[in-house]
């Protein structure tokens, strides 16, 4: 990401605004409660700015949200190329139907859980990994916007039992799921282990309903993900979704199971 146009734009505008305010890197760092080393790294394009850092810089430098607007575009650039189209669809969707047999869906992950997944399964490391973790967490803003999509997420019970990141991470993650289930537009369902074999075990997928009423889907694999818009393929996934949903517990029963599983992670 270093050297990309958006990184250079952000770094340049931060340097310009700081200079216009008559502040040294050390003085700005003191005002925003971050280290001077981090300010220097961001201005040199070696570190990507986090949301809170950016907001504090906007406030301290009186830039009227300019840095935050640049960072919003920068966060999209950080996304893996094949995922950018789906994030755009996700942000505009009126409804999302998600199924995950292995891990907590990205929109519902805590930062610690997302980081643990990357540590255990991603080829990325260091700053590159942190960029992806940050991008994943920022995507979740779609659930808290003025007109959020309705999200119906189904997970396999094994997702609640898989020790991603250890007991503390899992306990916090499952408590987070229980809290999200109280939002009026978020509905969580769990397929109990007793069900045995069912269609969803063939793999995870998400179906998004666009503002014009069309359905579009997303599939992931070991190499990359891709958007599915071919009518018959989308219809097949919708039918699989209906089969999966039919095997799941009710929202209330699922929340009870999630809370029970959270208490078991001690």
Enumerate the language-model features and the residues they cover.
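Hydrophobic protein-protein interaction segments
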Residues: 95, 99-266
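Basic, Lys/Arg-rich alpha-helical nucleic-acid-recognition elements, primarily the DNA-binding modules
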Residues: 1-74
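Short, functionally important structural connectors and interaction interfaces within domains
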Residues: 15, 34, 88-91, 99-100, ...
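A short alpha-helix capping/helix-coil boundary motif
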Residues: 6, 31-35, 82-84, 154-157
């Amino acid at each position: 990401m270093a050297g990309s146009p958006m990184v250079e734009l952000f770094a340049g505008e931060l340097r310009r605004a700081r200079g216009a305010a008559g502040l040294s890197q050390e003085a700005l760092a003191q005002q925003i409660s971050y280290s001077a080393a981090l300010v220097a790294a961001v201005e040199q394009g070696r570190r990507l700015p986090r949301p809170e850092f950016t907001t504090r810089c906007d406030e301290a430098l009186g830039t009227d949200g300019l840095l935050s607007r640049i960072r919003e575009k920068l966060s999209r650039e950080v996304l893996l190329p094949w995922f950018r189209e789906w994030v755009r669809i996700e942000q505009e969707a009126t409804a999302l139907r998600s199924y995950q047999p292995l891990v907590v869906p990205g929109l519902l992950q805590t930062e610690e859980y997302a980081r643990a997944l990357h540590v255990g399964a991603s080829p990325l490391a260091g700053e590159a990994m942190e960029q992806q973790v940050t991008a994943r967490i920022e995507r979740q803003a779609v659930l808290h916007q003025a007109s959020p999509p309705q999200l119906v997420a189904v997970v396999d019970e094994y997702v609640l039992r898989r020790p991603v990141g250890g007991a503390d991470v899992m306990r916090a993650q499952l408590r987070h799921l229980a809290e999200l289930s109280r939002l009026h537009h978020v509905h969580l369902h769990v397929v109990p282990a007793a069900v045995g074999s069912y269609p969803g075990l063939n793999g995870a997928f998400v179906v998004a309903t666009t503002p014009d009423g069309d359905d579009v889907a997303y599939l992931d694999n070991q190499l990359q993900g891709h958007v599915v818009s071919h009518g018959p393929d989308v219809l097949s996934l919708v039918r699989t979704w209906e089969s999966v949903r039919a095997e799941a517990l009710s929202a209330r029963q699922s929340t009870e199971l999630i809370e029970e599983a959270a208490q078991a992670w001690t």
